[in-house]
Amino acid sequence: RGLGDVYKRQGIYVVCHVYRNNSMKTVSSINDEEVKKFEHLANEWWNTEGKFKPLHMLNPCRLEFITDHLSMHFKKDLTIDKKPLKGLKILDIGCGGGLLCEPMARLGAEVLGIDVVEKNIKVASLHAKKMKLDIDYRHISAEDLLRKKPKFDVILNMEIVEHVESPAFFIEICSNLLKTRGLIFCSTINKNFKSYLFAILGAEYIMQWLPKGTHDWNKFIKPSELSKLFFDSGLRVKDTKGFVFNPLAWSWELSKRDFTVNYSICATKE
């Protein structure tokens, strides 16, 4: 019986648990070519006009979805309190350069950002220091972190699930890291013809917003499939919203109905 997972946040990290003769052997493997390719982009994280421009454009929409639910679920007033998220422990898996970690820290949360690309962690740490933000960044996988048995009030799993080999295994790890009554956020890309046109042909080949090969359509996942994975891991879906690009305003907007390409799910552990 084998169980494996591929972590890829601008790089690939594989962890396989192989069972033979009632013993378990853990094998770790890093795809050097993938890591080198995306490590080359690491210094681009905070360049709003660079390779990560699409993510910078999407970030306000992601933050709106996250903070709306944090405010309601944990009864936090983001309009009055100076540090409304104080007391919350937040884990950002696949944190990259810290685009979500930094705003969460500014709101008062205790933030841990993890990534399997070491250069991403170095870039994120340097930028946080420059911004005078206290953020704990670690070069570690979610599996290795789980072995330390920490628990978090909130887990951010944004634009990462489409890069893992086994989404079911990955979501199960996330569930085990989440406190009871905690919240988990997962944004990814739907699997249909439109998502192929927009997320791959449009974004990577026509507009060249993303490097070619960033996404594999076969790893895209439908909202119904992702919701089932949450359910199977003991998580209850609270809300699903679409991230829709408005070409007239040249910005991203939240949608209650359009999940055809980019979407995000908020779930809780009961």
For the regions a protein language model found, what residue spans apply to each?
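Short, small-residue-biased leader/transition segments that mark boundaries at the very start
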Residues: R1-Y7
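N-terminal, positively charged/glycine-rich alpha-helical extensions of SAM-dependent methyltransferases
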Residues: M24-F52, H56
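A C-terminal cap/extension of S-adenosyl-L-methionine-dependent methyltransferases
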Residues: F52-L55, M131, I206, K228-E270
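Conserved alpha-helix/loop element of class I SAM-dependent methyltransferases that forms part
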Residues: M57-K86
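Conserved hydrophobic residues forming the short capping helix/wall of the S-adenosyl-L-methionine
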Residues: L70, F74, A128, F230
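Conserved SAM-binding loop
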Residues: D77-K83, L88-K194, P223, I265-A267
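Acceptor-substrate binding/catalytic loop of class I
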Residues: Q208-E225
